[in-house]
Amino acid sequence: WNKLLQISKVDVGYAPWVLEESKSVFNQRILPLLLDDDSHYRLYGIFLLNQLNGKEILMTEEIWSILESMNDYEKLYLTYLVQGLTLNKLDFIHRGMLKLYEIDYFKNDTSLFIDWIDQAEAVISEKVDLAEVDRYLAAFVYMHYKHTNHAMTKKQIIDSFEVTRYKLDKTIAFILSI
């Protein structure tokens, strides 16, 4: 494969085994989310679809018909991802999911992502400045795991999300108030 990449004068795309893995992830993890009755699960499915290597190859007519049958909010998110529209509210949700996805510890925690979408919508409804997603995400993650077997210390959260203890404490108080 590396030899082919070196001698090829055109972009050969992803390796066959990468595409096969993407197809498997799509069928086992993403498709059930896209078909879920809950809009938050479908949004998360759209997010994961956008993260896949070789997603263009997986976009069959059947998948497009599923995407076309989604509600306007979900289609707006899809348009935001594909065309790069500036949509502050969806951008806030998306930036939070991206940050979670970049951290291996959180990457496969479906309930965390679904709960983030719900929490982000609650934060958005409070009409606060959405520029600093990390502070809201840090407070949310701390609260999310606080009462589980995976509780994280504030120090771990501060290190993972690069926020100050002051901002974390202040944002936890804010989230508890809504």
What is each PLM-predicted segment?
Residues 18, 33, 37, 128-132:
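Conserved aromatic-histidine-acidic binding/catalytic patches
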Residues 10, 25-26, 135:
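Alpha-helix N-cap/N′ positions at the starts of helices
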Residues 1-2, 23-35, 54-65:
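Amphipathic alpha-helical scaffolding segments comprising HEAT/armadillo-like alpha-solenoid repeats
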Residues 6-22, 43-54, 76-85, 143-146:
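Structural detector for internal amphipathic alpha-helices that build alpha-solenoid repeat scaffolds
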Residues 40, 55, 61-129, 133, ...:
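A cyclin-like helical interaction fold
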Residues 1-4, 10, 102:
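Extended, low-complexity, acidic/proline- and Ser/Thr-rich intrinsically disordered regions
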